[in-house]
Amino acid sequence: MADTQTQTPEVDYTLNNPNTLTKYKTAAAISHKVLDAVSALCVEGAKIVEICQKGDELLDEEITKVYKGKKIAKGVSHPTTVSPSSHVTPYTPLVSDAQEAETTLKAGEIAKIQLGAQIDGFGTIVCDQVVVGKDEVTGREADLITATHYANELLLRLMVPPGLLAGGSEEEKKKAASEKAPTQGQISQLIEKVAKAYECNVVENTTSWQFERNEIESEKKIILSPGSGVKGDGVPDVGEVWGVEMGLSLGSGKVKNLPLRSTLHRRTTTTYGLKRPSSRQTLSEIVKKFGQFPFSLRQLDDEKAAKVGVVECVRGGVLRQYEPAGDSDNAPVSRLLTTIAITKNGITKLTAPATPDFTKVKSDKKIEDEEILKILERPLSKSTGSKKNKNNKKKTAKKTESGDKE
C-alpha cells in the first residue's frame, strides 16, 4: 500500500533562496539603524552600561516591527557592547557591578561599538568606532582609523573567490578561476603591510568567521597575526556569509586578559547534566531568549542570579565565556566588523562600518605599496548599473583607493 502521508518540504536555508538574503538584509537594516543611534550616544562622560542598555532596548524595539504575525524566531545576534580605547574585545558591563557600572567614555578615546540582529537565525553583526568628543581627528588616532579602514577593505577584496569577477573571453575567465586563493599567511602579510604604512600593528588573533543559520562561529575562519599554535582554516566561497573582523593597534598588537568580569557568553552544542536548579533555570532562559547567539548577563531577567547560574554552565562547557582582553601596552585599539554575503555577483556588504570622512580624519601617512594599491582598486562585485554609473564608480575607486559601503 502506498504511503499517503504528506511530507513537509525541506526548507532551503542557503543564499540560493531569495528569502534567506531578504532576512539577512532585514536584520542588517536593524543593525545599522541601532548602530547610528548608539554612536550618537557615545559622548564624553556617558556611562557605558547605560549606552549598552539603550542599544539593546532599541534592538528589541526594531526587531518587533518586522515579520509580525509570522512564526519566525528573531532577536539579538550580538548585544550592544561599547569598548573603551585599549579594549580589544567587546565590553558590556553590568549594572550590579558597581565599579564597572560607573565606567564612562573619555574625550579623545576610540570607542568601538558592536551589536547585531537576527531574523530566523540569520544573524548580522556590525562593529564601528567613534572618537569621543572630536569632530576632527589628527595624529596617531587618525593614522589608526585610516589604516584600519584600508586594511579592512583590502581583506574584503582578498576574500573574493578567484575568477568570480573576471571579464574577457571564456578562456580568460577559466584561467582566472583556476588561480589559487591567497593563503592565510599571504593575507596576513598583505594586511600587515597596510598596518606598517601607518605605523600600526595588527591585533593578534583577529578572527573572521563563516556565519551559518543560528551560528556565528562555523567551521571556516581567517586568523590575522595568529599567536602560537593558532591557525585559520578554510577559503571563502560563493554561497557563504562571513563576519569579517579587522583590528589594529598603536601598540605591539599583543593582547592581555583584563581583570574584569566575563559578562559575554554564548550557548555551545555541548550537553551536560547541570546539578544546580539556578544553573538549569539560567540555561533555560538563555536558550529561550538567545539560542546560540552571544548575550550579556545584563540581558537576563535577574542579573545577580545570572552571575551565579552561569558558573556551572561554563564549567560544564554548555556556555562559552568570552574573556575581556585589551592591548598589552594599554595602547589605543581600533576594530571593525563587516557581515558579508558572497554570491555569484561578488561580495555584498550586509552590515558595514561607515567609510571615514577623510576631510575630518587627517593622517599624514599613505600607502605606497603598488601591489596593495592595485588590490584596493579591485571591485567587490559585478557592476549592474548603466555605463555612466560604471564610469563614476571607477573614478571614485581610484580617488579613494577603496570602495564605499555598498
Residue ranges and their predicted role:
Residues 1-406:
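Active-site neighborhoods and metal-handling regions in enzymes and metal-associated proteins
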